[in-house]
Amino acid sequence: QIFIEDFKKLVDEGKKESVRSVIKFMANSIQSELFTKCMYNDRNYQGIGYMRAILNSFLLDLSFDFWQKCNIHLKVQNTPIISCVWNHSRMIDGLMGLGEINKNPFNGISFAYNIHAFLIEPLGLVVVDNGNHSVNAAIVYNEGEIIVNTVIDISEVLEKYRFDEKKYVNIETNKKVNIKNLKNNSESFTYTFGLLFEMARVLKNAKDENGYVYYDVN
């Protein structure tokens, strides 16, 4: 609760670069966890679909009607991104073969055919569920740009649910949700995902009140 209150202060004070940096830092911490679990080949997320559980930590039971096609170019160095790496060999191949350091800069346009990326609004966070290992290399090297092809506004689920520091609950009834592809049908993939969900609420309220958006997709 204190963390969210402090984050709200950054938003209220119009500290857009600080807001962006905090969200990107948290996305990077998640990426680091996925990276290390994949590196040691010991990922153990039994009973749930790995990539769907990550995405559903933001979407919950949101209808596909809120999925909108788009073609948005975003710079990796400015954008919070979570890329769902799943194979340590492919991950290392990406790190060895891509990047300016390897004289092969990541080019989102060239890789667009293989990358599927979602922009989660109003959080301004990108989740990648295809082309994961190439995008992971771009995140590690902090370079290039990524093309987002689907934008999803989660404002509706923010009206219905909240994260209570362990699980998602219905705001009206205070009962935990029962949604397929969530951890134990009610929990965020990791605690950080739940925090990001509540940070999205802060950003939604600021947008509703005064049009506040910390990122630019134009």
Regions found by a protein language model. Name each.
Residues 1-125:
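Short alpha-helix boundary/capping and kink motifs at helix termini
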Residues 127-130:
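Short His-Asn-centered micro-motif
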Residues 132-146:
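Short active-site loop/helix that positions an aromatic residue
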Residues 147-210:
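Accessory, usually C-terminal, subdomains that scaffold auxiliary metal cofactors
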Residues 212-218:
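N-terminal accessory interaction module
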